């Protein structure tokens, strides 16, 4: 093996797994708010658009500051930035929960509630974005050109897994209180920060003679169509995730019982829906995709059709079991569509550029979640079923594009 093919700053498999677990914790901590905060903030007196505005403003700040935190990671060390990011996320979420509890208790009312929650949530967008660029940079230095795409792809997959585990985990913790799922994610974030602090080696300087892979431009003609495709996909996902807890609350009109409050019932049933989605993803991923390794060009339109069908059925059929089954279908489709879209994006460039392509494609989910939740909340205020049908329409258009355009493009040889 040539020196140029050796990792610049190698990490053991265990250390890489710890970074992956931190990405899972980050994904869970970001998406749990759609299950818990959305219905409770509305109960505190905020409108749907105000709730989405708080989360959207924070997500926009988060996405805009990722490059800045990447430069800080290069200057002060990847480990320091990753540990700081996990603790910042846990602590800012803790302060946000306390502010929300104050609003629910009536200590803060009216427009003051919106400004308090928005101000507290902004600190998440300011302080927490460092994990993703620092982890990507650390994985880039810890891999060779041959293993880089797989390493960076693993980080993106971990973030996606976390985004599903967060809402699904609410099913387990909701019986202990409507806010318990967020407390669980806070403990997860802080624990991940401690593991990063103890498991990763001290910050090491990169060899002066080494050069990092040149990043791809966003408008690179080979990758941009795949980036735009994934942005549209996660834009649609964001519309539904933001509004699903409201949809379940307004449709089924839960009432309090001797064993649980109406708020706990909303969080529990929303968590069940997302748990079914997670089950569909796991079964499809490990029961079909992994053992058979199908052509991504063929499974992409099929997966998108599954997702679109699930969204339509979620509104068309009333019983909760049918909604849960619809989300299971969505999960099956997502397990086909997302890995296929990412794989096609990575394969669109030369082998030595695949790591850079994977890092660029990883920007699609947070970018989609900047606009999707706010648009979804606006549509929901007009008609509760509009986000589901709009998302289904977006998925249908993407499926048609994948069938007529993407499926006819040749795969770049690996």
Segments from the language model and where they lie:
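Transmembrane alpha-helices of Major Facilitator/SLC transporters
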Residues: 62-64, 269-292
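Hydrophobic core of transmembrane alpha-helices in multi-pass small-molecule transporters
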Residues: 24, 106-130, 231, 322-336
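C-terminal ends and interior cores of transmembrane alpha-helices
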Residues: 87-110, 305-318
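Helix-loop boundary and gating motifs at the non-cytosolic
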Residues: 9-59, 225, 234-257
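Helix-loop junctions on the cytosolic side of multi-pass membrane transporters
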Residues: 193-210, 404-414
């Amino acid at each position: 093996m040539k020196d140029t093919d050796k990792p610049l700053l190698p990490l053991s498999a265990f250390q890489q797994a710890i970074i992956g677990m931190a990405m899972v914790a980050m994904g869970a901590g970001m998406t749990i708010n759609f299950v818990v905060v959305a219905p409770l903030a509305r109960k505190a007196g905020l409108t749907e658009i105000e709730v989405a505005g708080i989360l959207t403003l924070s997500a926009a700040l988060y996405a805009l500051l990722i490059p800045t935190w990447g430069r800080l990671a290069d200057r002060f060390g990847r480990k320091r930035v990753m540990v700081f990011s996990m603790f910042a996320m846990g602590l800012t979420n803790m302060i946000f929960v306390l502010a929300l509890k104050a609003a629910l208790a009536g200590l803060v009312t009216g427009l003051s509630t919106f400004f308090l929650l928005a101000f507290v949530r902004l600190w998440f967008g300011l302080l927490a974005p460092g994990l993703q660029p620092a982890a990507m940079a650390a994985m880039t230095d810890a891999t060779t050109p041959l293993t880089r795409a797989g390493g960076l792809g693993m980080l993106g997959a971990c973030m996606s897994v976390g985004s599903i585990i967060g809402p699904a985990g609410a099913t387990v913790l909701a019986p202990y209180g409507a806010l318990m799922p967020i407390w669980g994610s806070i403990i997860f974030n802080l624990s991940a920060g401690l593991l990063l602090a103890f498991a990763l080696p001290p910050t090491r300087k990169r060899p002066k003679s080494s050069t990092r892979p040149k990043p791809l431009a966003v408008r690179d003609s080979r990758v941009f169509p795949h980036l735009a495709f994934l942005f549209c996909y996660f834009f649609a996902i964001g519309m539904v995730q933001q509004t699903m807890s409201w949809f379940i609350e307004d449709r089924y009109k839960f009432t309090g019982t001797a064993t649980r409050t109406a708020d706990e019932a909303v969080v529990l049933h929303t968590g069940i829906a997302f748990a079914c989605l997670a089950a569909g993803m796991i079964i499809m991923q490990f029961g079909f995709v992994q053992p058979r390794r199908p052509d991504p060009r063929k499974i992409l339109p099929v997966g998108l059709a599954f997702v679109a069908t699930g969204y339509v059925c979620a509104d068309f059929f009333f019983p909760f079991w049918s909604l849960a089954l619809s989300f299971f279908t969505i999960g099956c489709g997502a397990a086909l569509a997302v890995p296929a879209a990412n794989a096609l994006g990575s394969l669109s460039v030369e082998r030595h550029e695949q790591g850079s392509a994977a890092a660029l494609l990883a920007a699609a989910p947070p970018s989609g979640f900047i606009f999707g939740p706010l648009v979804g909340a606006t549509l929901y205020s007009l008609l509760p079923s509009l986000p589901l049908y709009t998302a289904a329409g977006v998925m249908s258009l993407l499926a048609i594009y994948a069938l007529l355009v993407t499926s006819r493009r040749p795969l770049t040889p690996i």
